[in-house]
């Protein structure tokens, strides 16, 4: 939750006027629980969405980086409160995305062309099964960690939110 990519996501969404909520999945950082191969982590996402809707948030967007994008993509099929989703470097070379079916909420996927965990070609192959109208933004030179490329990532997110604002 405290890395350059998540910090950029939070900053850009807040600057665009969004209320943001970020959390560590179970067993990460100071969070309780044990890693649950994505199953329990989906429950974490659903609990966070429930928390927000109980506080009057009606329009919800999800944005996830790496493992978080995978868990979000799996969890979103079981909720009806999410309007849009952004995936940053979905780890398609590392996690099984085959069970992510048609998900119209997926609007934007961002990956670096040097990312070996989220290879652009694999994402291009999977994207039509997730949402054929989703946009893939490739950041030249960026790897999975976006060191030296967070400014470009923030520009991509800012443009997306300007076009798809709250």
Language-model-derived ranges and their functions:
Residues 45-105:
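Primarily recognizes the serine-hydrolase "nucleophile elbow" in alpha/beta-hydrolase
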Residues 119-127, 151:
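Short alpha-helix in the alpha/beta-hydrolase fold that links the catalytic acid
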Residues 113-118, 144-145:
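Acidic catalytic loop of the alpha/beta-hydrolase fold
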Residues 142-154:
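Catalytic histidine-centered segment of alpha/beta-hydrolase-like enzymes
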Residues 1-55:
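Serine-hydrolase catalytic machinery in alpha/beta-hydrolase-like enzymes
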Residues 25-29, 92, 143:
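Alpha/beta-hydrolase active-site loop signature
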Residues 129-145:
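Catalytic histidine neighborhood in serine/cysteine hydrolases
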Residues 103-111, 115:
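Short beta-strand/loop motif that positions the catalytic acidic residue
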